[in-house]
A protein has these predicted regions:
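Membrane-proximal intracellular helices of multi-pass ion channels
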Residues: 1-329
Length: 329
């Protein structure tokens, strides 16, 4: 999406970003409309939009402030970190797009994500690793629905109320399925990255036989491998293109990750819906935990952050965060 015939100006760049988001955003409000629970739809939208705006803010800040390694060479960076970016779109336009394309299963890029600053890469990956904000092609916000089930169950236990969602009891069976679905995503990403890292270190002959994978070893090389599996698992399609990934190893392993992370969660989510549909409707009472409040929205955000985001903290500490510290300290 950086070709001048498609995206010629900063204005068209903003318009295309809004086009990417408009249907996923509208689906959240449609959920509240069809359930006749508009406050519930609004609370979901608020959580997702908050995460999106934070991501846009962080990426824009670091891209507009430039690369300290280039500063140390005495090169002025009035326009920000412009490596891998279109001059007519600028660092801010690329930062905006990079977050927009990763909070949805869009995958298009208008600049090279591999050339963004380390914490910008962290945000891009976290959007896909959390795999919840605004949903994406084919699955919508089904992953957010899983975290709602977990949040309802935990919140109910914390305050001593019966866990209920849309008038249906949430019990152990639904919780087990939701937990498996929530943990599968980090599992396939981290196992794939660990396997690739192990082969790179312990079987260099195999890596060389495939033409060598990494043009950027060390911290950024790990980020490239992590991004590859993250993008596959999230059905995104963007990549850190410094990785030589058009090989037998990457095509087969990424295909396996894509299949597992695409279809197993859908089966689990539909199973939860089926289990809840079979249960008797329970009218709201004084003991019902309300799911359309700001408090529950904050609880859901906390569950998403703890279960999804923190699962990836160790690998980010060795890749994006370590690279950031190497530049700024």
């Amino acid at each position: 999406s950086s070709h001048p015939l498609e995206n010629p100006t900063f204005l068209t760049n903003i318009f295309e970003c809004c086009s990417i988001l408009i249907i996923p955003m509208a689906m959240i409000w449609a959920l509240g409309f069809y359930l006749k629970r508009k406050k519930f739809g609004a609370s979901i939208f608020a959580v997702m939009f908050f995460a999106y705006i934070v991501g846009v803010g962080i990426n824009t800040y670091y891209e507009m402030n430039g690369n300290p390694a280039i500063d140390n060479m005495g090169i002025a960076q009035e326009n920000g970190a412009m490596e891998g970016k279109e001059v007519r779109l600028g660092a801010a336009g690329t930062a905006f797009w990079s977050v927009t394309t990763t909070v949805t299963s869009n995958g298009s890029v208008n600049g090279m994500h591999d050339s963004t600053m380390p914490l910008s890469g962290l945000i891009e990956m976290l959007n896909m690793q959390i795999n919840t904000w605004f949903g994406g092609v084919g699955v919508g916000f089904m992953n957010y629905y899983v975290f709602i089930i977990i949040a309802v169950f935990i919140s109910g236990l914390m305050v001593g109320r019966t866990p209920e969602f849309l008038g249906k009891k949430v019990e152990a069976k639904e919780m087990k399925i939701a937990t498996i679905v929530a943990l599968l995503h980090p599992f396939v990403i981290l196992v794939g990255t660990a396997l690739a890292s192990y082969l790179y270190v312990h079987n260099p002959a195999f890596v060389e036989s495939e033409g060598g994978w990494l043009n950027n070893p060390s911290f950024h090389g790990l980020s490239e491998m992590l991004y590859e599996y993250t993008s596959c698992a999230a059905n995104n399609g963007s990549g850190f293109e410094g990785l030589g990934d058009n090989t037998m190893f990457w095509n087969y392993t990424c295909g396996i990750v894509l299949i597992l992370s695409r279809f197993i969660p859908i089966v689990g989510q539909v199973a939860i819906a089926g289990l809840l549909a079979e249960k008797k409707y329970i009218p709201e009472s004084a003991g019902t935990l309300k799911t359309d409040t700001a408090t529950f929205g904050a609880m859901t955000f906390a569950v998403i952050f703890i279960v999804a985001a923190l699962s990836f903290f160790p690998v980010h500490a060795l890749s994006t965060i370590a690279e950031h510290l190497s530049l700024y300290i």
